[in-house]
């Protein structure tokens, strides 16, 4: 596991991973900042809790928005990442967003890795690499997401779901 406090019990959704590096957002770090204070035009569309999430330590002044939509069509505000998940352009008018959005989350900053850095951390067992479920991105109780993701796994990794925060006081 990584010693970096930015990633302690973090669930990171990778948005991009290539030979140029990797970029993702932390899904389970809600802030107390209301989305309406940052991007007021999108506030009513955001999933509960309607706060900005801390996406990571890189560029905390930048906002990234992920959405869930079964059929985004050819909306100019949608950049598909998978069948249901995409990046939403917060500079656009929410009325031009694809219909059928069932989840929206705004992140301040992101998590970034230089070429080969994430792979090296994975080789040192610094990360569990697991499949995401679309609902993971939009849970209301994000603080429980780390345990929930691990608990649904098969095999030894599942045991970490009940691992104490500080094993030395166990």
Predicted segment positions?
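A short aromatic-anchored loop/beta-hairpin motif
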Residues: 1-170
């Amino acid at each position: 596991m990584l010693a970096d406090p930015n990633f302690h019990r973090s669930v990171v959704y990778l948005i991009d991973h290539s030979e140029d590096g990797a970029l993702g957002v932390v899904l389970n770090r809600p802030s107390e900042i209301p989305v309406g204070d940052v991007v007021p035009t999108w506030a009513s569309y955001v999933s509960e809790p309607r706060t900005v999430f801390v996406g990571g330590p890189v560029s905390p002044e930048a906002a990234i928005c992920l959405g869930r939509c079964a059929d985004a069509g050819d909306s100019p505000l949608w950049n598909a990442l998978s069948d249901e998940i995409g990046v939403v352009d917060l500079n656009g008018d929410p009325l031009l967003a694809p219909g059928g959005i069932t989840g929206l989350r705004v992140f301040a900053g992101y998590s970034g890795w230089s070429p080969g850095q994430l792979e090296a951390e994975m080789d040192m067992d610094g990360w569990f690499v697991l499949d995401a479920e679309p609902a993971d991105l939009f849970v209301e109780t994000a603080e429980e997401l780390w345990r929930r993701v691990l608990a649904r796994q098969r095999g030894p990794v599942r045991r970490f779901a009940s691992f104490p925060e500080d094993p030395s006081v166990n």
